[in-house]
Amino acid sequence: MNHLIGDPGSLLDQFNPKYIQFISDNNIRQPSDIFVFLGEHPDTINDGYYMNRFHEYKWGNLPASYHNGATALSYADGHAATHHWTVTGEHGTIRPPVKGAVGGIIPAKPITDFQWVVDHSSILK
Protein backbone atom coordinates (compact mmCIF):
# COMPACT_ATOMS: atom_id res chain seq x y z
CA MET A 1 0.00 0.00 0.00
CA ASN A 2 1.21 3.49 -0.87
CA HIS A 3 2.61 4.93 2.37
CA LEU A 4 1.28 8.39 1.48
CA ILE A 5 -2.33 7.18 1.55
CA GLY A 6 -3.97 6.99 4.97
CA ASP A 7 -2.20 7.48 8.30
CA PRO A 8 0.87 5.25 8.63
CA GLY A 9 2.05 6.98 11.79
CA SER A 10 5.01 9.27 12.25
CA LEU A 11 7.69 6.83 11.13
CA LEU A 12 6.82 6.75 7.44
CA ASP A 13 5.51 10.32 7.12
CA GLN A 14 8.91 11.78 7.92
CA PHE A 15 10.74 10.29 4.92
CA ASN A 16 8.97 12.43 2.29
CA PRO A 17 8.05 15.66 4.10
CA LYS A 18 7.65 17.70 0.90
CA TYR A 19 4.74 15.51 -0.25
CA ILE A 20 1.13 15.49 0.90
CA GLN A 21 0.08 12.64 3.19
CA PHE A 22 -3.50 11.91 2.10
CA ILE A 23 -5.27 11.06 5.37
CA SER A 24 -8.71 11.03 3.74
CA ASP A 25 -9.61 10.07 0.18
CA ASN A 26 -11.60 13.32 0.00
CA ASN A 27 -8.28 15.21 0.07
CA ILE A 28 -6.77 13.51 -2.99
CA ARG A 29 -6.75 16.17 -5.69
CA GLN A 30 -6.01 13.86 -8.63
CA PRO A 31 -7.44 10.46 -7.63
CA SER A 32 -7.07 9.01 -11.13
CA ASP A 33 -3.29 9.66 -10.96
CA ILE A 34 -2.50 8.51 -7.40
CA PHE A 35 -2.08 4.79 -6.76
CA VAL A 36 -3.23 3.11 -3.56
CA PHE A 37 -1.95 -0.44 -4.12
CA LEU A 38 0.69 -1.87 -6.41
CA GLY A 39 2.44 -5.17 -6.82
CA GLU A 40 5.76 -5.12 -4.97
CA HIS A 41 8.82 -7.10 -6.02
CA PRO A 42 9.24 -10.13 -3.74
CA ASP A 43 12.86 -9.25 -2.92
CA THR A 44 11.82 -6.04 -1.14
CA ILE A 45 8.61 -7.07 0.64
CA ASN A 46 9.24 -6.34 4.31
CA ASP A 47 6.02 -4.79 5.63
CA GLY A 48 2.59 -3.63 4.49
CA TYR A 49 3.69 -0.32 3.00
CA TYR A 50 5.31 0.60 -0.28
CA MET A 51 7.77 3.40 0.51
CA ASN A 52 10.82 5.01 -1.06
CA ARG A 53 12.68 8.13 -0.02
CA PHE A 54 11.98 10.29 -3.03
CA HIS A 55 14.96 12.64 -2.67
CA GLU A 56 17.49 9.76 -2.70
CA TYR A 57 16.59 8.23 -6.08
CA LYS A 58 17.18 4.75 -4.70
CA TRP A 59 14.71 1.88 -4.56
CA GLY A 60 14.01 0.79 -1.00
CA ASN A 61 10.88 -0.97 -2.23
CA LEU A 62 10.94 -2.10 -5.84
CA PRO A 63 7.75 -2.52 -7.88
CA ALA A 64 7.02 -5.97 -9.27
CA SER A 65 7.49 -6.67 -12.97
CA TYR A 66 5.67 -10.03 -13.22
CA HIS A 67 3.33 -9.05 -16.03
CA ASN A 68 5.70 -8.91 -19.00
CA GLY A 69 7.73 -6.11 -17.40
CA ALA A 70 4.73 -4.44 -15.76
CA THR A 71 2.96 -4.32 -12.42
CA ALA A 72 -0.69 -3.95 -11.53
CA LEU A 73 -1.88 -0.88 -9.63
CA SER A 74 -5.17 0.31 -8.18
CA TYR A 75 -5.83 4.02 -8.03
CA ALA A 76 -7.65 6.27 -5.58
CA ASP A 77 -10.57 6.78 -7.99
CA GLY A 78 -11.20 3.02 -8.04
CA HIS A 79 -9.76 2.07 -11.43
CA ALA A 80 -6.99 -0.46 -11.91
CA ALA A 81 -4.29 -0.59 -14.57
CA THR A 82 -0.89 -2.00 -15.38
CA HIS A 83 2.22 0.06 -15.89
CA HIS A 84 5.15 -1.17 -17.99
CA TRP A 85 8.58 -0.36 -16.63
CA THR A 86 11.34 0.73 -18.98
CA VAL A 87 14.63 0.33 -17.09
CA THR A 88 16.46 -2.99 -17.39
CA GLY A 89 19.99 -4.05 -16.48
CA GLU A 90 21.92 -4.08 -13.21
CA HIS A 91 19.99 -1.19 -11.65
CA GLY A 92 16.82 -1.91 -13.58
CA THR A 93 13.26 -1.92 -12.39
CA ILE A 94 12.61 -5.08 -14.40
CA ARG A 95 14.40 -7.91 -12.61
CA PRO A 96 13.69 -11.52 -11.71
CA PRO A 97 13.16 -12.45 -8.05
CA VAL A 98 16.11 -14.00 -6.23
CA LYS A 99 15.14 -16.58 -3.63
CA GLY A 100 16.27 -15.44 -0.19
CA ALA A 101 17.04 -11.88 -1.29
CA VAL A 102 15.53 -9.32 1.06
CA GLY A 103 16.00 -5.61 1.19
CA GLY A 104 16.47 -2.88 -1.28
CA ILE A 105 18.55 0.23 -1.62
CA ILE A 106 19.07 -0.20 -5.33
CA PRO A 107 20.19 2.93 -7.20
CA ALA A 108 17.55 4.09 -9.69
CA LYS A 109 19.69 4.58 -12.81
CA PRO A 110 18.28 6.11 -14.92
CA ILE A 111 15.54 7.61 -12.77
CA THR A 112 12.75 7.18 -15.36
CA ASP A 113 10.73 4.49 -13.53
CA PHE A 114 11.51 5.89 -10.09
CA GLN A 115 10.22 9.31 -11.12
CA TRP A 116 7.02 7.72 -12.44
CA VAL A 117 6.42 6.15 -9.00
CA VAL A 118 7.10 9.50 -7.28
CA ASP A 119 4.70 11.31 -9.62
CA HIS A 120 1.92 8.79 -8.93
CA SER A 121 2.42 8.45 -5.15
CA SER A 122 1.44 11.96 -4.09
CA ILE A 123 1.88 15.62 -4.98
CA LEU A 124 4.14 18.30 -3.58
CA LYS A 125 2.80 20.37 -0.69
Where would I find each of the regions flagged by the language model?
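Short, well-structured segments within or immediately adjacent to enzyme catalytic domains
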Residues: M1-K125
